[in-house]
Amino acid sequence: MKIGYVQFQPQFGEKEKNLKRVLRFLKNGVQEEADLIILPELFNTGYVFRSMKEVEKLSEHIPEGETTKTLIHFAENNSLNIVAGICERDEDRFFNSAALISSDGNVSVYRKTHLFYKEKIWFSPGDRPFSVYETEKARLGIMICFDWFFPEVIRILALKGAQIICHPSNLMLPYCQTAMLGAAVQNRVFIITANRTGTERGVKFTGKSQIVAPDMRVLASSRRSGEEVKVVDVNPSDADSKRITEYNDLWDDRRTELYKSLLN
């Protein structure tokens, strides 16, 4: 299976331009025979909102919105699975969401659970459980940017059978890329972090998108700056074995009776 990410710099508020640019990256990924490509968080709108009017203007319904409809058409025509960060409107609420657009045109939505900084002003926290989505070649879990700070997220997704964690991001802090090495091996999963780059309204983003294997190997990575699509070949079943040594299994060795304080 070939998996990848797009790293680029959206222009705030320029939804049509951002979508057209991403479609060019996706076409390049298709030329490399990609099966799955992850886009950054809020890829079509930009990130640094300054008013609810901006949120209202730039948000859209999923899957009825123009961004999702365009990506559905592309996914179906190119046998591609896409995970895209979108500013979602649901009646009078707004969410920082990720849409999984499957190659058959089906759409699933995850809403960011752990809102970062001023996102708490604009968005409602996610109201849906951490779910695993079955595609034709792999089982996918989704988290968005700051969700990574909470190790329970990846652990729950891994326990539910996710082989690949899709991680659309707009990272500003410098920790995530290193932390995902540990998260991948601690849960024996692939993690694709698709980060944006550049500066927007005074906020600098860290770039350095990457794909990490269950054994901590970095299979692909980008620099802090620069726009590109990267695709690598993986075997998702590498994430199925939780065996660490002859005597140790990641799931069997858990002592859940001692973990109850995590729920307090």
Model-found features: residue ranges?
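CN hydrolase (nitrilase-like) catalytic-core segments centered on the catalytic cysteine
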Residues: 67-81, 148-229
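Short polar catalytic/cofactor-binding loops
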Residues: 7-13
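Cys-nucleophile CN-hydrolase/nitrilase-fold catalytic domain and related Cys-dependent amidase chemistry
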Residues: 15, 23-103, 173-187
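C-terminal beta-strand edge segments of enzyme domains
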Residues: 132-134, 196-264
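Active-site catalytic loop in hydrolytic enzyme cores
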Residues: 89-160, 169, 178, 182, ...
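Extreme N-terminal starter segment of soluble prokaryotic enzymes
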Residues: 1-5
